[in-house]
Amino acid sequence: MPVTPRQPYGGDLVFTAFSGSHQDAINKGFDDLNEVAARTDKNVDDVTWEVPYLPIDPKDIGRTYEAVIRVNSQSGKGDIAYIMKTDHGIRLPRRMQIEFSKTVQHVTDSKGGEMNSKQLWDLFSSEYLDRAEPLQRIDHSLATADNGDDAITATVLWHGKECEISGTGNGPLAAFVDALHELDIDVSIIDYQEHAITAGFDADAAAYVECEVNGIPVHGAGIASSINVASLCAVVSAVNRALTELDE
C-alpha cells in the first residue's frame, strides 16, 4: 500500500522543509542544540529537543536528517551552510555563504529541481577549489627575513608558464600576497578564516579569504593537509575567480 509523502511518520517527506525560511530556522535550531551540548558538557542526543518545524527528533523513530533540508531555488544561505557543514565539514563564513547561495540559486533556477549533497559539493569544488587558471601554486618554501618577517619563495604556474616569485610579510599569507606583486597581481585581504575539517576528507584544514584582487571583491577557499598550504590555495582561488570574472 503506498504511503503519501507527508504521512506521519513514514512518508518520505514528513520531515522535509522546502521553504528557505523554514530551512534556515531548522538550521539555527540544530546550531542551538550543539551550543547547549557544548556549554553543558553533554552529548547532543541528551539535550532537550527544541528545533523549529520538527516536533520530534527524526532519529527517535529511525529516520535520518538527510531529508530534512532539500536544496532548491527557495533555499537560503543557512540551509546550504548546514549541509556543507554536516556532510562535508566545511564551515563557510557568513558573507561567503551569501555568495555561494547565489551560485546555487542560479543553478537550481536554470536547471530546475533540487541539488543533493554530492551535487552541492561538486558545485562548491568547481567554483572555489578546482580552478587552476591563470594561476596555480606548485610549491613554496618559508624562511625568516632579517627583520623577523616571514619570507616566501613560491613556484607557480602563471598562464601556463612556470616561474618563481618571492615576498615578505607578517606571516606566510601576507608574504605570498607580497610575492604576487611580481605578477602584477594586487591582493588586499579583507577577512581570513580557517578551521580543521572534521568529516569526510583526507585533508584536515580549510581556509577562506575575502579580498579584493586588482580591485575586484571576491572570495576564495583552499583545502589541504597543512593550514599554510590551505591559506595560499585560498588566495590562489580568489585570484583565479577574480581574473576569470575580469576576462568575462
State the predicted function of each range.
Residues 125-128, 181, 240:
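Signal for well-folded cores of large energy- and translation-related assemblies
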Residues 190-196:
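Long, charged, glycine-rich C-terminal linkers/tails
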Residues 217-248:
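Mixed-charge, glycine-accented linear interaction segment located at domain edges/termini
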Residues 152-156, 197-220:
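Positively charged, aromatic-enriched nucleic acid-contacting surfaces
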Residues 168-172, 210-217, 232-234:
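Terminal-proximal interaction/regulatory segments of ATP-powered molecular machines
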Residues 170-188:
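A short, contiguous, amphipathic alpha-helix enriched in charged residues
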Residues 1-166, 201-204:
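A mid-to-C-terminal "edge-of-domain" accessory segment
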